[in-house]
Design a protein with these regions (language model features):
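N-terminal Rossmann NAD(P)H-binding glycine-rich loop of SDR-like oxidoreductase domains
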Residues: 3-23
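SDR active-site strand-loop-helix element
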Residues: 6, 30, 65-69, 107-113, ...
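Rossmann-fold cofactor-recognition segment
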Residues: 41-51
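NAD(P)H-binding glycine-rich loop region in Rossmannoid oxidoreductase-like domains
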Residues: 49-86, 117
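Conserved cofactor-binding/catalytic machinery of classical short-chain dehydrogenase/reductase
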Residues: 51, 64, 91-94, 106, ...
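Active-site segment of SDR-like NAD(P)-dependent oxidoreductases
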Residues: 71-75, 112-120, 151-154
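Conserved Rossmann-fold NAD(P)-dependent oxidoreductase catalytic core, especially the SDR/UDP-sugar
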Residues: 86, 90-124, 146
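NAD(P)-dependent short-chain dehydrogenase/reductase
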Residues: 122-124, 128, 132-177
Length: 177
């Protein structure tokens, strides 16, 4: 099966891309940065989710699109809410619109438990709004979807902005969280 993983160079997206490849799928990663973990059986297209032509190129011909293209740093969300809204909401809408155009079978969207919470500030707002768009694309255009709502995720490949990693790093290095 041909699968596109948007944000496939990141923490969660790279793990999902690897598992999809291990299961015999033809995986293409679309990200604004090169993946440190790119496998030989994966393709990557470097680009911005707002570059319509590049995004269309990677989505066209896919059967399933996974969307991990998002910002997730809660501190950064407080400092730069407009950037979060643009990336997490409008980036999702751009991908959804192309999935509708190319008749993708399923859009799998990475969200957060914060989407249904009064915690998480602007990050929560951006995930809730993007979830609403995913659901509305189904209601209006019958674009099948799955929304994944994670808690606080941590592990190998997480970056320094990861909340759990910050707490663990502070504990390991003898600082109070």
């Amino acid at each position: 099966m041909k699968i596109t993983v948007l944000g496939g160079s990141g923490f969660i997206g790279s793990h999902v891309a690897d598992e999809l490849s291990k299961r015999g799928n033809k995986v293409t990663i679309f990200d604004k940065k090169k993946s440190k973990w790119l496998r030989k059986d994966q393709k990557i297209l470097i680009g911005d989710i707002f570059n319509y032509k590049a995004l269309a190129k990677v989505i066209r011909g896919s059967q399933i699109v996974y969307n991990f293209a998002a910002l997730a740093d809660l501190d950064m969300a407080m400092q730069k809410p407009l950037i979060f809204a643009r990336t997490n909401i409008l980036g999702t809408v751009q991908a959804l619109n192309l999935c509708r155009k190319y008749k993708i079978k399923r859009f799998i969207h990475a969200s957060s438990i914060y989407a249904d919470s009064n915690q998480g500030g602007f990050y929560s707002c951006s995930k809730r709004a993007s979830d609403d768009y995913v659901e509305e694309f189904y209601k209006s255009y019958k674009l099948n979807y799955t929304i994944l709502r994670y808690g606080s995720v941590y592990g190998s490949r997480s970056d320094k902005s990861n909340g759990v990693r910050k707490i663990l790093d502070k504990a390991i290095w003898g600082k109070k969280p």
